[in-house]
Regions:
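Compositionally biased terminal segments of proteins
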Residues: 1-245
């Protein structure tokens, strides 16, 4: 099986899910219909066109135990990385047991695998809860807002507040930086223009962290990563100022 080379797109996602349904049925899963709830990048590429790919598929899985074997077999067949379809996010802060309730039907594969997704304000709420400055969280929020505006179905701040409340109990569970971000982007309203700027910033932050990790291996944690990015940028800015003097 290959490592770290898998790319999932809106085009091939359905092919892989269809293959999983086929293998699950062959393994005897037809006695227990299965359900997947796609979240994160997989939910973005399933519902929207602004993002081309994701490198893994995060999901909530309701199925017989053979589902794990079916997923691994499809991974072997298509040379996908280990954990290409996983439930790891359920151990993160963005998980909520209420995601099942607020997910939306997507498609059924093989007459046995029902797939649902999280979208619109609920996906935005999850991205705000996660709030990673070096991933696609903020650019995904901008992209979702932009697409809904194009569709003539704009997402309001009231809807986002309701989603945050339904999933996490209220804004107190969302970081101050994420709250400031959503307030500013909603007030600005230029979602499409902002998307490219934010995405570039995320890529810069990722490169910054790679550089930091090279100098200080193992020093980065989920608790200090935002402070590291902020401090590193301040240091870079000071150095640039000194070079200009």
């Amino acid at each position: 099986m290959s490592s770290d080379s898998s790319v999932f797109t809106g085009e091939n996602l359905n092919d892989y899910l269809k293959a999983v349904a086929k293998e699950y049925k062959k393994m005897g899963g037809k006695a227990m219909p299965a359900e997947l709830i796609l979240i994160g990048g997989a939910a973005v590429i399933a519902n929207y066109g602004f993002r081309e790919m994701t490198t893994d598929i995060d999901a909530i899985i309701h199925a017989a135990s053979v589902m794990k074997d079916a997923i691994n077999l499809v991974g072997d067949q298509y040379h996908l990385q280990n954990g290409w379809l996983n439930t790891d996010f359920m151990r993160t802060a963005s998980y909520s047991p209420k995601l099942d309730q607020y997910s939306t039907y997507y498609r059924t594969f093989g007459g046995i695998l029902s797939v649902r997704t999280v979208q619109a304000e609920y996906l935005i709420a999850m991205k705000l809860r996660s709030g990673r400055l070096y991933k696609n969280d903020r650019s995904d929020i901008a992209g979702i807002l932009a697409e809904h505006e194009k569709r003539g179905e704009p997402i309001t701040m009231d809807r986002i507040t309701q989603a945050v409340t339904n999933l996490y109990g209220g804004w107190e569970q969302i970081s101050a930086s994420s709250q400031l971000f959503i307030q500013q982007i909603m007030q600005n309203g230029e979602y499409q223009k902002t998307y490219g700027v934010i995405r570039q910033e995320e890529q810069d932050n990722k490169e910054l962290l790679i550089s930091f990790e090279g100098k200080y291996p193992g020093a980065t944690t989920s608790e200090n990563v935002e402070r590291i990015i902020t401090d590193f940028k301040k240091k870079q800015k000071r150095n640039q100022t000194l070079n200009w003097l």
